[in-house]
Amino acid sequence: MKLEDIRREYLQNALSEDNLLDDPFKQFETWLEHAVASNLPDPTAMVVATVDDTGQPSQRIVLLKHLDNDGFVFFTNTGSRKAQELKGNNKISLHFPWHPMERQVIVYGEAKPLPTSAVAKYFLSRPKESQLAAWASAQSRPVSSRKVLMETFANMKNKFAKGEIPLPDFWGGYCVVPQKIEFWQGGAHRLHDRFMYQRQADNSWQITRLNP
């Protein structure tokens, strides 16, 4: 297989500063709405990049669960690798790869832990099976087999058979407060359109076109 021959031209759209909204959150919402309306699979899926204390980065796909003018919100097991890395270094990057639309968005910022009340509100909105899975999984830690995992899930199902499933004390959430947000639109001949929003001291945003 010749990987160097695998390519395609990006011809769907062009992006100019005249097309951009002044507010990057509103611009993101507009693009996300387009992704949802276009029936893209998992339009809220984002690659979350963190770094450990040796400088080794790691990535994983997580779902965006809320967006407002404070930032981008996701939830996770606080014993997970990403949560442990964020304890030591809360710098974070998010990547939304909307390939069918020839678009991507990259967010650079800091992850701020959410208050327990916000975490509990979201946790209780999840399907019961997802709540049980949160209790059953010691995320990122070794497990001897899937059978063991499913047995733990069954035990949790029995344990919480009646009443409301409580919020695990090892489950939390983060708001990613962005300092920079890049919007990328594929262009013909690899002459892509890239615009970077950078937060200013007064919380306004400066927009700069970048070379592809």
Swiss-Prot record:
Catalytic activity: pyridoxamine 5'-phosphate + O2 + H2O = pyridoxal 5'-phosphate + H2O2 + NH4(+); pyridoxine 5'-phosphate + O2 = pyridoxal 5'-phosphate + H2O2
Residues the record lists as binding FMN: 60-65, 75-76, 81-82, 104, 139-140, 184, 194
Pathway entry: Cofactor metabolism; pyridoxal 5'-phosphate salvage; pyridoxal 5'-phosphate from pyridoxamine 5'-phosphate: step 1/1; Cofactor metabolism; pyridoxal 5'-phosphate salvage; pyridoxal 5'-phosphate from pyridoxine 5'-phosphate: step 1/1
The keyword Flavoprotein is annotated on this UniProt entry: yes
GO biological process: pyridoxine biosynthetic process
Enzyme class: oxidoreductase
Cofactor note (record): Binds 1 FMN per subunit.
The protein's role, per its UniProt record: Catalyzes the oxidation of either pyridoxine 5'-phosphate (PNP) or pyridoxamine 5'-phosphate (PMP) into pyridoxal 5'-phosphate (PLP).
Family: Belongs to the pyridoxamine 5'-phosphate oxidase family.
Listed NCBIfam families: pdxH (TIGR00558), PRK05679.1 (NF004231)
Subunit structure: Homodimer.
Name of the protein in question: Pyridoxine/pyridoxamine 5'-phosphate oxidase
Organism: Pseudoalteromonas translucida (strain TAC 125)
